[in-house]
């Protein structure tokens, strides 16, 4: 008897299948990550919770591909007020700085993060990026102020 894979396992498998095309192809070829995006869009709340629980064990490469799928520049995006920010907190310094530079600003223009805990994690991640010289003082200050203001709004202060 074979056990059926969870949707999270299916998504992870699809992401690892994308390794063969490479991350650059995701940037250049429309629709390459479409199947993975459709799997993600079919998630129930339970699937999403499982994904959040399993993401810390995913490789940085997995996180990079997932971040691209969440924010596909060519077509549709995955409307989530948490996932891209959470990936930012888990990624290594290089990927986190890249996410900050390329995608998070657009993410925040379109979404409001409602999790104060996530905003705290993101603020801590910024500290690490700045102390490891992955972002300059101006970028650091901008994001600290932005996230602090967002956090204040969420707290209703």
Labelled PLM ranges:
Residues 27-42, 56, 64-76, 98-113, ...:
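Structural detector for internal amphipathic alpha-helices that build alpha-solenoid repeat scaffolds
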Residues 1-35:
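N-terminal "cap/leader" segments of large eukaryotic alpha-helical scaffolds
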Residues 2-5, 119-157:
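Eukaryotic acidic, Ser/Thr-rich intrinsically disordered low-complexity regions
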Residues 19-27, 40, 54-59, 88-94, ...:
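Alpha-solenoid helical repeat architecture
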Residues 46, 61, 95-98:
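Structural detector for tandem alpha-solenoid helical repeats, activating at a conserved register
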Residues 74-77, 94, 130, 134:
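Residues at alpha-helix boundaries and short interhelical turns
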Residues 87-127:
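A mid-sequence interfacial segment
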Residues 2-13, 42-54, 77-89, 113-123:
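Amphipathic alpha-helical scaffolding segments comprising HEAT/armadillo-like alpha-solenoid repeats
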């Amino acid at each position: 008897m074979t056990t059926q894979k969870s949707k999270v396992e299916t998504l992870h498998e699809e992401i690892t299948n994308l390794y063969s095309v490479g991350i650059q192809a995701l940037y250049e070829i429309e629709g390459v990550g479409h199947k993975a995006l459709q799997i993600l869009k079919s998630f129930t709340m339970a699937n999403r919770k499982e994904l959040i629980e399993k993401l810390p064990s995913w490789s940085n490469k997995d996180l990079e591909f997932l971040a691209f799928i969440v924010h596909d520049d060519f077509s549709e995006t995955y409307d989530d007020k948490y996932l891209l920010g959470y990936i930012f907190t888990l990624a290594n310094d290089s990927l986190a700085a890249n996410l900050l530079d390329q995608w998070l600003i657009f993410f925040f223009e379109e979404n409001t993060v409602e999790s104060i805990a996530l905003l705290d994690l993101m603020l801590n991640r910024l500290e690490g990026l700045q102390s490891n010289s992955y972002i300059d003082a101006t970028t650091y200050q901008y994001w600290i102020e932005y996230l602090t203001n967002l956090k204040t709004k969420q707290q209703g202060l």
